[in-house]
């Protein structure tokens, strides 16, 4: 890829990774409109690293507190709200890990088409709207409990289907289960850390085993652009939902789904 493609695709990935609007739906548009080829494994690793650094840095205080409390619960038997939340996040990660390994090949073969992405973009946009309208919006992430955490984890596993949006599915589930908007978003973002880390490790392993020549300058650019875009996106998203709710993102998803359908049937 040339520098322009790296910047545009890393910007798209960084901006859409944490918004409930589906990164896969957006990454398909350049290929449809401009005829760009698949970005490749090295680029995927780079943007995942950039997104991971962004969410860890943004929630650095929470991450440190969760990690230290989790370790204290293991080695010292000390229980706290943070240790419970850390265990719930780990529990919520398991469905995506298990189903991801089990269904990876099937998803790659049958569910990566633009038609599937268009349908899921619209369908899960409507679910997000319904959840935002009907939610009690009373609970914080510290009141989630293991049952709700596991259900949110299964929602995260649904995001293995392209077009669903990991953050969209998890925030929708959290709202349905009674979390307030900010808590739903924070829980979703914290849940993303082990998932993105695991994906980056697996893709890095595949990359080095493939023996492909790595353009480290393009990789560094992809990391930097996706980091800045993702960090900015997290900050603005939390401000927007506290004032306007999920409606702007629902409208955007419906418009994007319509645009994808137009390209499919043109």
From Swiss-Prot:
It is a multi-pass membrane protein. Keywords: Antibiotic resistance, Cell inner membrane, Cell membrane, Cell shape, Cell wall biogenesis/degradation, Hydrolase, Membrane, Peptidoglycan synthesis, Transmembrane, Transmembrane helix. The keyword Ion transport does not apply. InterPro entries: UppP. The chain crosses the membrane at residues 1-21, 39-59, 83-103, 111-131, 144-164, 183-203, 218-238, 246-266. It comes from Shewanella woodyi (strain ATCC 51908 / MS32). GO terms for biological process: cell wall organization; peptidoglycan biosynthetic process; regulation of cell shape; response to antibiotic. Pfam families: BacA. It catalyses: di-trans,octa-cis-undecaprenyl diphosphate + H2O = di-trans,octa-cis-undecaprenyl phosphate + phosphate + H(+). Its EC number is 3.6.1.27. Catalyzes the dephosphorylation of undecaprenyl diphosphate (UPP). Confers resistance to bacitracin. GO terms for molecular function: undecaprenyl-diphosphatase activity. Bacitracin is thought to be involved in the inhibition of peptidoglycan synthesis by sequestering undecaprenyl diphosphate, thereby reducing the pool of lipid carrier available. It is found in: Cell inner membrane. Belongs to the UppP family. This is Undecaprenyl-diphosphatase. PANTHER family: UNDECAPRENYL-DIPHOSPHATASE (PTHR30622:SF4). GO terms for cellular component: plasma membrane.
């Amino acid at each position: 890829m040339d520098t322009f493609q790296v910047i545009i695709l890393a910007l798209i990935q960084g901006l859409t990774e944490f918004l409930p609007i589906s990164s896969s739906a957006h990454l398909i548009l350049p290929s449809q409109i401009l005829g760009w080829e698949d970005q490749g494994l090295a680029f995927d690793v780079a943007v995942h690293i950039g997104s991971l650094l962004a969410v860890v840095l943004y929630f650095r205080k929470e991450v440190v507190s969760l990690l230290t409390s989790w370790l204290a619960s293991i080695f010292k038997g000390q229980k706290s709200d943070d240790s419970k939340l850390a265990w719930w996040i780990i529990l919520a990660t398991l469905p995506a890990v298990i189903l991801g390994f089990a269904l990876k090949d099937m998803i790659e073969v049958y569910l990566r088409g633009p038609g599937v992405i268009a349908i899921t973009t619209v369908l899960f946009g409507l679910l997000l709207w319904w959840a935002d309208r009907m939610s009690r919006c009373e609970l914080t992430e510290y009141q989630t409990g293991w049952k709700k955490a596991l259900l949110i984890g299964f929602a995260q596993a649904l995001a293995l289907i392209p077009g669903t949006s990991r953050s969209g599915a998890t925030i929708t589930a959290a709202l349905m289960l009674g979390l307030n908007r900010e808590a739903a978003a924070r829980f979703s973002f914290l849940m993303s850390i082990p998932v993105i880390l695991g994906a980056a490790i697996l893709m890095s392993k595949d990359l080095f085993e493939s023996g492909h020549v790595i353009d480290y300058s393009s990789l560094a650019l992809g990391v930097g652009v996706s980091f800045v875009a993702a960090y900015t996106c997290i900050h603005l998203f939390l401000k927007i939902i506290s004032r306007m709710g999920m409606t702007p993102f629902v409208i955007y998803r419906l418009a994007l789904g319509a645009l994808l359908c137009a390209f499919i049937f043109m």
